[in-house]
Amino acid sequence: MLSGLLWMQSYGAYVVLLQDDFGWSKTMLAGAFALTRIESGILGPIQGWLVDKYGPRIILRIGIVIFGLGFILFSRIDSILTFYLTFAMIAVGSSLGGFATLMVSIVNWFNQHRAKAISFSHLGYSLGGLAVPLVILCLEGYGWRFTAMLSGLIDLAMGLPLVQMVKHRPSETGDQVDGEPEKLSSTAKSEVSVFDANRDFTARQAMRTSSFWLISTGHACALLVVSSVMVHVVPHLTEGLGYSLSQAGLVVALMTGCQMLGQLAGGYLGDKFNKRFICICCMVAHAIGLMTIAYASHYSMVLGFALLHGLAWGIRGPLMVALRADYFGPSSFGTIMGFSSLIVMFGMSGGPIVAGLLADIYGNYELGFTVLAIGAFVGSFCFLAATPPKAPARVAM
């Protein structure tokens, strides 16, 4: 929630104010976001291995401290170099103290209800997005420097105590996966254990499957849209469509509300129906939504974008984790996600750069958003082809 509220979903508003104060181009501001996503992608395999080995709590604690200090230093920047350096700190802190680290714990705690559990965990991020108008009010009333300083202090004050609640595996507290210790007979328990063991891939085994690469590429294509919206939708609404910063913040809040509905629906749908088919539908919705906002000529089109993109993002996001966990098992999940991030980072970093560069050249976001929408549509075919891999070979005992 803190990462979504203070940074990821609020960054578009910072872009507008930083442009006004320093005169930096959209490409330069998008470049900072892109470089930090590359940095986080490279960090992914190491981070995943550390979480698998030492558990999520210590990694979360380190990440929260780096994130908070990064925001405090960000409030003092006076050049593009110091902006990039502090932004890199924020990104590293967000990676270590956020999504990927927490998902390792959730995947280990849930099996039958995994998609629902992941969906509920994503609600925190969405709740942060709903509060973006409050961040924008603070930005407009007190300036971006004060808001950044306050954000860093809030992160440290709230994040560190919350970390104490996180446990790596149910065995640490004497619990069972899915919290149901007595519902299965000893025979059924044995059968489930054998099944789970057969589905457990090492990182090396997972990377030998086509599904690993197809899911990662499809995820990257989705993030072409998600990342470009994070960075550029507020500038597009204010500069291109004539909305005020506060009105743009309300659009972000509406989009986030739709995202929350999507997450709740996605958890149920993901546990009941084919996850790949759901992901394909979401990729198409991402593409249509971005095309709608690119050529919006009426507020109804802006609302349509918020609905389509928010629902697609909310439904698809948790399934990216659940699908990998279903295919490759929980034992090496952190490491597998880490190596996958090396591919996913190209979408997360490329989207803002493409949109920003083409906006600087042509004076609007229409072409950039169109190109990225096509990329999302192409990504739907990756999920179509990502069939479940065969269980890895085991040495006979």
Regions flagged by a language model, labelled:
Residues 11-15, 204-261, 351:
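Extracytoplasmic gate region of multi-pass secondary transporters
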Residues 59-72, 277-291:
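Structural signature of the two symmetry-related core transmembrane helices
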Residues 82-97, 301-314:
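Hydrophobic core of transmembrane alpha-helices in multi-pass small-molecule transporters
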